[in-house]
């Protein structure tokens, strides 16, 4: 099935036609001057959804996510704390990886640290100077001349003639009102940088933030990428500058598809550390919410729409996951009779799966996919309540254990995309299921001694049996 993605560069949905196999995917990672907030994780979960959908559709993916461990903010933090850059950043790096695991975000294939690629960055800057697209300013910093790159502004759709063009800027972050030549190598300032610098042919200093991503992506993925993803904040100046640098170095198109997620809001305002209205994942875990609940909240809205964060939204996510958990537990009930997978159940599953996938291939429309999931759950619950399969006029077959297992297999399949379904137990080995069936048979003929023996045998294999009013359940110890 064809996948269509909204390309920021063209401002259109385009059929995804990768140039590379595996697909080369680069995503903007954290700047490790502090703990990542959940606004950041909205972007990372969007990128995780993108990757999961690609894998689900059969693509191989090589994924690189950078770690920015040298920039204005990390230097300021290390200077304030009076420690090395590495010592300052390391706790935030460890916390970031722990957060990824808590939120069930798949690991990237590589996590390059900017500080590990300084020699390659220096070499690239020298190449840009030799080409005449970069120059050394009066402050001894090296700048990229945007006037030497004719396509500058294409990604962010800037009309350069209508914008005020300053001479140059050495800050890592700035807005469109300060359009200017941007820094490639920031000259060393002892009052600002302390003892943190690298030697180069241009003098002591450190690389600019924009150059870092260009060099790390080119070093690990080559000169032309299939997809570059990040937050909408990164379109200008960061990604615009990446294009200018990278294409000046390679003389090839840098990225085929640019994807950007929109802001997470708090009280209808953008969540950001500068505004002081942010929450870290740890804040929410301390309030009693789970990683799955946070993931579901951040996952459920379309990535190109703003998502408003509220406590009510988190509680709604909790209820949605409870509904999913109750449904899964119901299917895992082993008391259903043995029978075939009824055609009506198989048809309902296939219809749901087709709707689920079709929505995802339409620019990752997860909202529509989740709506289809809950509609499917409603239909199956209704049929179980009636002790039948999916009813037709000619067939009212009893809902079977095989029906339940078929649906559970389908849910495990779609969880390859969602990464959030709360399965209450792992797959039960066939030999344990056989012992469970033998025990049920012994109980039916009131052979309690044999039933107890089989219970002990099941326990010895790491599973427990719970007998209740609604039937018997098997759980892993």
UniProtKB/Swiss-Prot annotation:
SUPFAM superfamilies: Anticodon-binding domain of a subclass of class I aminoacyl-tRNA synthetases, Nucleotidylyl transferase. It catalyses: tRNA(Cys) + L-cysteine + ATP = L-cysteinyl-tRNA(Cys) + AMP + diphosphate. Its EC number is 6.1.1.16. Keywords: Aminoacyl-tRNA synthetase, ATP-binding, Cytoplasm, Ligase, Metal-binding, Nucleotide-binding, Protein biosynthesis, Zinc. InterPro entries: Cys-tRNA-ligase, Cys-tRNA-synt_Ia_DALR, Cys-tRNA/MSH_ligase, CysS_C, Rossmann-like_a/b/a_fold, tRNA-synt_1_cat_dom, tRNAsynth_Ia_anticodon-bd. Belongs to the class-I aminoacyl-tRNA synthetase family. GO terms for molecular function: ATP binding; cysteine-tRNA ligase activity; zinc ion binding. The gene is cysS. Its main location: cytoplasm. Binds 1 zinc ion per subunit. It comes from the Bacteria. This is Cysteine--tRNA ligase. Zn(2+) binds at residues 28, 213, 238, 242. The keyword Protease does not apply. PANTHER family: CYSTEINE--TRNA LIGASE, CYTOPLASMIC, CYSTEINYL-TRNA SYNTHETASE. It is an enzyme of class 6 (ligase). Pfam families: CysS_C, DALR_2, tRNA-synt_1e. The keyword Thylakoid does not apply. Monomer. NCBIfam families: cysS (TIGR00435). ATP binds at residue 273. A motif ('KMSKS' region) lies at residues 270-274.
